[in-house]
Amino acid sequence: MKKTIFITGASSGIGKATSLFFVQQGWNVIATMRSPENEKELSGSPDILLLKADVNDTSSVLDAMTTGIARFGQIDVLLNNAGYGQQGIFEAVTLEKIRQQFEVNVFGLMETTRAILPHFRKRKTGTIINITSGAGRVTVPLVSIYAASKFAVEGFSEALSYELESQHIKVKIIEPGYISTPFYDRAKADYAFDPQLEDYSKFQLEMNDLFSSFGAMDTASPQDVAETIFEAATDDTHQLRYVIGPDLLPMINLRNSSSDQDYIDAMRGQFMPEAFGKSMQQKN
């Protein structure tokens, strides 16, 4: 029997690329999104079932899973991909925006995971793949809320992997670096700004200039991520984390090879070189 993957947030970027790649590899795909009626590229294959599901509406997720199982017989892999990135100085991000970030990136992911577990337990097999981010391992300024949500998913996923081992269910974490997708367009559109916080103006300009240069770096593509997701789904190992992106690997390697304080000092020197240099001189 052909295997089946259930994907959230399949309308663009990593979700869409993964849907197309898995079909090319001979899988069935249940591609879910909030507005499937607007999707054209994924609608032509008999092996792709387009369904409406919003991770913040558990009943819609359960309905999509039930419909998908009726169509394809079973679900073998859940890909929790739906999410977005709230950016901006922490003081400028309202509590409403913070809650919404966690509703989508954390609570929606958790409830989607909860929804699939009875099916996986009944079958005594299944793989849950959670898309986190480099920001869940090594974070930077202006993404404190997004990073907090991804750190939460990292901790949840690791702890869950230990729990579900007893049920023969695997948990995998995909950690992309910078990927050029509509994800970043939304992040820019949702950027939290408060003109009254003038004290941060110079810092924000410098950081935005720095982050704008990331697009010119050697980075991974949605296709690269899709291929790594396929590896995680099929490699039959207990590997938990899969890091993607030449921009991210050096930062993770630095964190792993340095003491905690040496790493923090290096990052502070990167983001606030003048102020950090003065503070280090005063210490010495």
Feature annotation, model-predicted:
Residues 11-12:
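Conserved glycine-rich cofactor-binding loop
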Residues 67-80, 86:
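A glycine-rich helix->loop->beta "capping" turn
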Residues 89-90, 97-99:
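Substrate-binding pocket helix/loop in short-chain dehydrogenase/reductase
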Residues 113, 149:
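Active-site helix of classical SDR
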Residues 133:
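Residue(s) in the substrate-gating loop at a strand-loop-helix junction
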Residues 169-214:
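C-terminal beta-strand-loop-alpha-helix "lid" module of Rossmann-like NAD(P)-dependent dehydrogenases
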